[in-house]
């Protein structure tokens, strides 16, 4: 590996050596030697040695069944350890400047100065900063919580070993601890034995808050406060809340029959329980710290005659939090609920704690106030009483089914058969009616009752418990009005953000018309109180039309929505449903935000952070602080130095690129009759269904083809065999078509001057670097029927042409020239991913030959799936 990355290289080889010791202890020399042979052959084969590639294939074909699991596990574990070493490297003191972006805020302030942005405008933009990260469980984090906890501890050991003044004894002790952790990981299950329930997923989300975000939020705000004081002369207001969190875990019922209203209610209780538990930890720490006796009158009044006034106040808060835990425990376990005062709103903690904070400052103890107490006050604003706010997500047809069943019962026709105009008229009429719509004696079907019960759960909770009610597959104005009506009928006393999610290509293109229609309804304007949230779907649009076409539809929809809302004087928050992979809208955060349409971040940023990306971006406190800094600086830059409006000729060419790429994509995915059988044979798509990943089924409709597959398994399957087809198909072909039409110079100009376009091509380069045509070809040779082989050949040829087309327009000779660290990171893992790919192809070959494959083969296959996901740094 490049000498630039010496510290990382050294950590990777140390972890590899310790893993080798563990394998030797557990399985003796035979397995270790096999692993070493495969690793060396793979490295040599990657460098182009044909003889060693043939030897590698033979070596893997000749492995007996009982050796497959330990060999696969060795590479799987090594990739997890490599990921950990790399993640640690980005926050370590040895980190190179071009890797760590040492201070994104500092470089932003320099840019603002160069562009003569006034301090007044900058201060206002900071006050308006609103980053809401929405934690979602799908695509599910493939690494088990057990393993993640061990990886966090490994990170702590690496941090210790970095200290140069560590004594020989301390170093040996830390290395021994590392070896123990690696051994614990080796002897634990890599794969979950059962699918997680929605409750398990929610607990995983709370664990991320407890282990990382709880510490990261005050750290980030402290750092930002210091930066702002240096640049603006004023810090962050004490009640600033630039970053906060919502969650879909336990609220997302779209296509997940296991998320019921009962589950949602339980997750809300668990969320409050965890918040009270974490605040209790803070309060206990403050009791030990705030032993001072000098205080102002306000604190004296709160504390009464107690000598240690601060402690007296804190002890009363401790009682309140203990009561809250006791009451919630009783509710969670269906026990008798004690009648005690509990924490209902944040002011119960904020008011007394803020009084203590002011008193300490007034009494000359500001340095104490600005320690743990300030951290707790910052947390109160970020996490509230509920820790994370819960989104409810439901598919649009589930709401129209309720109204259809109801109107038939009332004898006024079938809502589903009405025109859109009639639906809107009916809904607006009912929304303004004073009489209830739901008859008392009506007994709805089970499915309809479930939707209404969910709305009742929303109505029974305070507004702060929820983020938004998201309507997936939203297509029309009536889809949005229907949810407002159902919430109203179920007694919801407050305005809920009802957020349409536009997912397919057609729905994105139609989103402006739908929102304009809604905004033209006076009653609706009253409901939304001049604030509208709209969610842009990335995964389904890419699956529907390919990445190039979907990317342009998303940009164009956002641009039109921003302008439409601005004309109407409505504040718009765009909610981005990005995935972890490019085929689902994933991109490096900073670049992705700066490539959005002008003014699209004025209403703040709301974005989903998906399963495995939560761990990579938010899993350690220091890494999370880096992520917050990237988000904050990108939003401030986008709002203070907005990108130029794209030229009309750029837009026109994007329309052409979009059309050509969509056609090229659909010609293969929908038009090629052999495509679905090829997909099923060349990837582990069918086997993926057995993996106990998330709580939701892999298909919306178990009998359908590609269109019924969820976006996640669709992409996951292709990233396993290294063709990564959905993340590039159609894009390069469209670019080459435009070059052939004489648009080379215009494409080069777009590349230089338009962040949207250059980011698209940068994402394609990253995908191309992760593809491996040799591996994809090997899967075909081992697994695919002869009559389907020409299709695989055709796709690989197309990929080669596409890479040339993109490099030509960028005037680059090699992929990822401008991101050497990203390329190095992919290379580092490739040496270990490729043996797993070869093993997986062999395992698929063996399991598909058996009616009932032996358990050891199935286990080994699951291990390769998890390992390749870790190596590709994404699931789907």
From Swiss-Prot:
One of its GO terms (biological process) is tricarboxylic acid cycle. Pfam families: PEPcase (PF00311). One of its GO terms (cellular component) is cytosol. This is Phosphoenolpyruvate carboxylase. One of its GO terms (molecular function) is magnesium ion binding. Forms oxaloacetate, a four-carbon dicarboxylic acid source for the tricarboxylic acid cycle. The gene is ppc. SUPFAM superfamilies: Phosphoenolpyruvate/pyruvate domain (SSF51621). Its EC number is 4.1.1.31. Disulfide bonds: none annotated. The keyword Magnesium applies. Its cofactor is Mg(2+). The active site is at residues 138, 543. InterPro entries: PEP_COase, PEP_COase_bac/pln-type, PEP_COase_Lys_AS, PEPCASE_His_AS, Pyrv/PenolPyrv_kinase-like_dom. It catalyses: oxaloacetate + phosphate = phosphoenolpyruvate + hydrogencarbonate. Keywords: Carbon dioxide fixation, Lyase, Magnesium. Belongs to the PEPCase type 1 family.
């Amino acid at each position: 590996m490049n000498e630039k990355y010496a510290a990382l290289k050294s950590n990777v080889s140390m972890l590899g050596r310790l893993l080798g010791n563990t394998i030797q202890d557990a399985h003796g020399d035979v397995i270790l030697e096999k692993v070493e042979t495969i690793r060396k052959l793979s490295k040599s084969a990657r460098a182009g040695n044909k003889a060693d590639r043939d030897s590698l294939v033979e070596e893997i074909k000749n492995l007996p069944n009982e050796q497959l699991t330990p060999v696969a596990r060795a590479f799987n574990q090594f990739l997890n350890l490599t990921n950990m070493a790399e993640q640690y490297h980005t926050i370590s003191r040895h980190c190179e400047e071009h890797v760590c972006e040492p201070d994104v805020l500092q470089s932003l302030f320099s840019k603002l100065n160069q562009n003569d942005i006034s301090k007044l405008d900058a201060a206002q933009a900071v006050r308006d900063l609103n980053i809401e990260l929405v934690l979602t469980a799908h695509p599910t984090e493939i690494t088990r919580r057990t393993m993640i906890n061990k990886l966090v501890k490994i990170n702590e050991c690496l941090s210790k070993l970095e200290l140069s003044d560590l004594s020989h004894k301390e170093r040996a002790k830390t290395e021994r601890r590392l070896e123990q952790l690696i051994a614990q990981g080796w002897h634990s299950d890599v794969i979950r034995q059962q699918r997680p329930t929605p409750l398990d997923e929610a607990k995983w989300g709370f664990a991320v808050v407890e282990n990382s975000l709880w510490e990261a939020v005050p750290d980030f705000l402290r750092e930002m406060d210091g930066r702002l004081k240096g640049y603006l002369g004023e810090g962050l207001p004490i009640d600033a809340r630039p970053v906060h969190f919502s969650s879909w875990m336990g609220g997302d019922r779209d296509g997940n029959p296991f998320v019921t209203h009962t589950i949602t209610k339980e997750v809300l209780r668990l969320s409050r329980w965890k918040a009270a538990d974490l605040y209790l930890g803070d309060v206990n720490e403050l009791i030990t710290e705030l032993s001072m006796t000098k205080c102002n009158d306000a604190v004296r009044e709160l504390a009464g005659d107690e000598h240690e006034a601060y402690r007296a106040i804190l002890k009363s808060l401790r009682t309140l939090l203990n009561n809250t835990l006791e009451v919630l425990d009783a509710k969670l376990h269906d026990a008798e609920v004690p009648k005690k005062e509990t924490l209902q709103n944040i002011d119960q903690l904020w008011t007394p704690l803020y009084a203590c904070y002011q008193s300490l400052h007034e009494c000359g103890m500001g340095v104490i106030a600005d320690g743990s107490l300030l951290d707790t006050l910052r947390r109160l604003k970020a996490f509230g009483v509920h820790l994370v706010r819960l989104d409810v997500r439901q598919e649009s047809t589930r709401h129209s089914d309720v109204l259809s069943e109801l109107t038939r019962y009332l004898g006024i026709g079938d809502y589903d058969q009405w025109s859109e105009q009639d639906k809107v008229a009916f809904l607006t009429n009912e929304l303004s009616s004073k009489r209830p719509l739901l008859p008392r004696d009506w007994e709805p079907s089970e499915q309809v009752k479930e939707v209404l019960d969910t709305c009742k759960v929303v109505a029974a909770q305070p507004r702060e418990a929820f983020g938004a009610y998201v309507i997936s597959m939203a297509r029309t104005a009536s889809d949005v009005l229907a949810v407002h009506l159902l919430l109203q009928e179920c007694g919801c006393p407050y305005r809920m953000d009802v957020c349409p999610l536009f997912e397919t290509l057609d729905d994105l293109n139609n989103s402006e018309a739908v929102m304009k229609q809604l905004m033209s309804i006076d009653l609706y304007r009253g409901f939304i109180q001049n604030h509208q949230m709209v969610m842009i779907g990335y995964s389904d649009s890419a699956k529907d039309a390919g990445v190039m076409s979907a990317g342009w539809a998303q940009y164009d929809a956002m641009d039109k929505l921003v302008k439409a809302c601005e004309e109407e004087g409505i504040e718009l928050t765009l909610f981005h449903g990005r995935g972890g992979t490019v085929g689902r809208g994933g991109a490096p955060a900073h670049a992705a935000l700066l490539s959005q349409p002008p003014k699209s971040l004025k209403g703040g940023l709301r974005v989903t952070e998906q399963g495995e990306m939560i761990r990579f971006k938010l899993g350690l406190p220091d890494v999370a602080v880096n992520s917050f800094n990237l988000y904050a600086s990108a939003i401030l830059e986008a709002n203070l130095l907005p990108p130029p409006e794209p030229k009309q000729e750029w837009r026109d060419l994007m329309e052409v690129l979009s059309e050509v790429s969509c056609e090229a994509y659909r010609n293969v995915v929908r038009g090629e009759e052999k495509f679905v059988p090829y997909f099923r044979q060349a990837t582990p798509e069918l086997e993926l269904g057995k993996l106990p990943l998330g709580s939701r089924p892999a298909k919306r409709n178990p009998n359908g083809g590609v269109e019924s597959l969820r976006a996640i398994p669709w992409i996951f399957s292709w990233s396993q065999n290294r063709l990564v087809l959905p993340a590039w198909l159609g894009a390069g072909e469209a670019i080459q078509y435009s070059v052939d039409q004489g648009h080379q110079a215009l494409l080069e100009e777009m590349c230089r001057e338009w962040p949207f376009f250059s980011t698209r091509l940068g994402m394609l380069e990253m995908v191309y670097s992760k593809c491996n045509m040799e591996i994809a070809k090997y899967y075909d040779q081992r697994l695919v029927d002869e009559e389907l082989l020409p299709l695989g050949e055709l796709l690989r040829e197309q990929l080669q042409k596409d890479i040339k087309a993109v490099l030509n327009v960028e005037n680059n000779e090699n992929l990822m020239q401008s991101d050497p660290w990203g390329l190095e990171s992919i290379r580092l893992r490739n040496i270990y991913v490729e043996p797993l790919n070869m093993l997986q192809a062999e395992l698929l070959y063996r399991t598909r030959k058996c009616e009932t494959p032996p358990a050891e083969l199935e286990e080994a296959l699951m291990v390769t799936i998890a390992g390749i996901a870790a190596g590709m740094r994404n699931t789907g």
